[in-house]
A protein has these predicted regions:
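Short beta-strand->loop
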Residues: 32-42, 112-116, 124-138
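A late-sequence structural motif
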Residues: 126-164
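Secondary-structure junction motif
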Residues: 65-86, 149-154
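Short loop/turn segments at beta->alpha junctions
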Residues: 5, 58, 96-97, 115
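Flexible hinge/capping segments at coil-to-helix
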Residues: 31-41, 45-67, 150-153
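Short secondary-structure boundary segments
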Residues: 25-26, 47, 72, 115-118, ...
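Central regulatory/effector-binding core of bacterial HTH transcription factors
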Residues: 1-29, 88, 94-95
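Alpha-to-beta junction loops
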Residues: 12-23, 41, 105-112
Length: 164
């Protein structure tokens, strides 16, 4: 088992270092990809923040505040979302670690965009709201287009049965 960011995992699959990997669909275009679940993206800010009174948050509203993001390559879905928005955020900090990002947000040093699955581990001291319009990442199991091990196929079947 290897732990890496999306770009590292993708490269490991392509170069045959691993049979398969968990990826977001956004980085799996040259791989065989089996979607497993959709994970909503949310705006995240400290408790007591002015945006906490809203039911949902637009990117332009969020970008009025200093933004803390994951280092490019760690979360390509959010990077892709940022490139689609006509309003450019003021990125104050960029980190590889979710714990560090949430700590900075919790301490009022900025706001961030995160995935609902990640937020389950960091609920204390932060508030999240859905983005408007809604956005999500599609997570799944990716394989090389040329590799197809029995172990990988067994794992895929197990995940499909367990998650769905």
């Amino acid at each position: 088992i290897f732990d890496g960011n999306y770009d590292e995992i993708r490269d490991w699959i392509i170069h045959g270092q691993v049979d398969c990997g968990f990826l977001s669909s956004i980085v799996a275009d040259d791989l065989t990809f089996y979607p497993l679940l959709n994970d909503p993206l949310c705006a995240v800010f400290p408790e007591g923040h002015p945006l906490a009174a809203k039911n949902s948050v637009t990117l332009p509203e969020l970008f009025e505040y200093p933004l803390i993001i994951e280092t490019p390559g760690c979360d390509n879905d959010i990077q892709h979302l940022l490139t689609k928005c006509p309003v450019r955020p003021k990125i104050s900090y960029s980190f590889r670690d979710d714990t560090l990002i949430m700590s900075f947000v919790r301490n009022g040093l900025g706001v961030t965009i995160s995935q609902e699955l990640v937020l389950k581990a960091f609920a204390r001291g932060v508030v999240s709201r859905p983005l408007s319009p809604s956005c999500h990442r599609t997570l799944g199991l990716a394989f090389s287009k040329t590799a197809n091990s029995v172990v990988s196929q067994t794992m895929l079947r197990y995940l499909q049965e367990t998650i769905h």
